[in-house]
Amino acid sequence: MNFHRKLAMKCTRTEIIGCGHYLPAKVLTNDDLSKMVDTNDEWISTRTGIRSRHVVAEGELTSDMAMHAVEMAMQNAGVTAADLDLVVVATLTPDNTTPSVAARISGRLGVKVGTPAFDIGAACSGFVYAMTMVDNMIRLGQIKTAAVIGVESLSKVTDWTDRNTCVLFGDGAGAVIVRAAEGEGTANDTGVLATKVYADGTQYENLYTTGGISATQTPGYIRMNGKEVFKFAVGAMCEACNNVLEQAGVSADKVDWLLPHQANIRIISSVGQKLDIPTEKVIVTVDHHGNTSAASIPLALSESVENGRIKKGDLVLIPAMGAGFTWGGLLVRF
């Protein structure tokens, strides 16, 4: 699903011109969870790297979090709703079965009538999938400016009696504003340099929710075969990274930051080690966000830009893997 070329010729790039994020006010620590299930802080942090996560307040919707994140991104980008040609939301926890969260966001923002808006359901890979779609649309000349949002209310599909899964997940939102820009067709360009997405539907039952509209008419709860997910995730994310690096003609030692989907510290660390990227170049936010699925990458990205870690000109390698199985990678220069 990519049309990138290695030839050095002028081309249209997709630049990230603004980032935003939002975390609900309520924080759930490992000590809090130890009062709910048979676990403790040491057990959770040692195995996952997670110490706390945020959860939505009563009545706080997925679209509410998305609004906070996209408004921050728009402000940082210096754009208004009138500038947007597209709104895309990656989520597995929408407000309603239909319409999409993206449509709801468009209406609340006051985006001009007729502007396309849609959701993407690729679980933890959702943001990478969304950016791939948007990058293709920008390079084909169909749009110029877009809002891309990753947002999840995973607390709504978490079984709080299952200690194997309830320790992992959190709620939150991240957003980016992207805009078409002219590039020279080299790896020194600013913007998306390469993308690649994948899926393997034979892995369906290793990570899924027990509910669904046609199956049970309920949201259900997340169920996961942790050993299989870990084994698959590390290899898949490395595969995606190597693919986008090869597309762009860049070696891993030129990467300034590895920003993986924040699943757990073991997966994050293993991917970094296999790619031979030093620990100090690996961005980790899972310790205070937990696994926020489609929100994790844009959330970590926005936080890292805000705190000054990611700077202008930095080359950022972004892999993800999620239910489906789905996986993919982005290579972006800021």
Regions found by a protein language model. Name each.
Residues 69-85, 239-256, 304, 308-309:
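Phosphate/pyrophosphate-binding loops at sites that engage ATP/ADP/AMP, CoA/4′-phosphopantetheine
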Residues 139-172:
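Flexible, glycine-rich active-site loops centered on histidine and acidic residues
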Residues 299-319, 327-334:
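Catalytic phosphate/nucleotide-handling subdomain of diverse soluble enzymes
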Residues 16-18, 44, 73, 84-87, ...:
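Buried hydrophobic positions in well-ordered alpha/beta secondary-structure cores of metabolic enzymes
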Residues 22, 90-95, 122-127, 150-155, ...:
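Acidic, glycine-rich active-site loops and adjacent beta-strand->loop/helix elements
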Residues 45-64, 92-146, 273-300:
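Conserved catalytic cysteine-centered active-site region
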Residues 2-58, 162-231, 235, 239, ...:
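Condensing-enzyme catalytic core mediating Claisen C-C bond formation in acyl metabolism
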Residues 42, 80-86, 113-116, 144-145, ...:
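Short acidic capping loops at alpha-helix termini that bridge into adjacent secondary structure
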